[in-house]
């Protein structure tokens, strides 16, 4: 390809012309040394070479660290003229490789940015480890504390149950008057109440049920049983004394009747 373009170049001087001796004899042209033709031939080849290979863009040599691996410059040098020859002068500049980092400080900046981004992960993990607090676990029955709070336990206000909550509690009490801990937790979760509220409601409901059915209280029953036992002991002792007194009176009356009979017999 280079030889064909060299032969077809317009600047190339065709050597087919009359001998110089004829022109020199007629004084048409001055005599030239053979170096003239070789100089013209060389200048034409250089001009073609400049057009074929555009001037290389200014490239500054950069210093690299030992850690970085330099790219082979020989391949880059051979690749640029070939691309320029195929694409032309206008597109030769776009084939340059992308600029490399100017200073080795950029990796440290990237590492610092990574270090700044890493502290966000412990916060997310800490937020994920926080326990989930459901509404029924909160102390909603505690009233607000006054400004004159002396450190004692605040006074609890009376819980106002809704109609839906009372209905569900009554239904549960109809089937079971005593709840297990698991069932109490389930009811508290479903009704958005605390376990303490469920426990107190069932205690009050059981007392009301015993009162309606006229059943003695368990605590009152124990005290009454002790009173009854003591009363029975006193009554038994009184009975023994009464029986002894009656026997004594009966024996005394029999003695009197016997003496009276003896006196009557002697009179006769």
Curated annotation (Swiss-Prot):
The gene is hoxc4a. Residues 258-268 have a biased composition (Basic and acidic residues). PROSITE patterns: ANTENNAPEDIA, HOMEOBOX_1, HOMEOBOX_2. A motif (Antp-type hexapeptide) lies at residues 133-138. Keywords: Developmental protein, DNA-binding, Homeobox, Nucleus, Transcription, Transcription regulation. Residues 70-129, 212-268 are annotated as: Disordered. One of its GO terms (biological process) is embryonic skeletal system morphogenesis. Its main location: nucleus. This is Homeobox protein Hox-C4a. Sequence-specific transcription factor which is part of a developmental regulatory system that provides cells with specific positional identities on the anterior-posterior axis. Belongs to the Antp homeobox family. Deformed subfamily. It comes from Danio rerio. It is found in: Nucleus. Residues 77-95, 105-114, 222-253 have a biased composition (Low complexity). GO terms for molecular function: DNA-binding transcription factor activity, RNA polymerase II-specific; RNA polymerase II cis-regulatory region sequence-specific DNA binding. It comes from the Eukaryota. It holds the Pfam family Homeodomain. Residues 115-128 have a biased composition (Polar residues). PANTHER family: HOMEOBOX PROTEIN HOX-C4, HOMEOTIC PROTEIN DEFORMED. InterPro entries: Antp_homeobox_Deformed_sf (IPR050609), HD (IPR001356), HD_metazoa (IPR020479), Homeobox_antennapedia (IPR017995), Homeobox_Antennapedia_CS (IPR001827), Homeobox_CS (IPR017970), Homeodomain-like_sf (IPR009057). Residues 154-213 bind DNA. GO terms for cellular component: nucleoplasm.
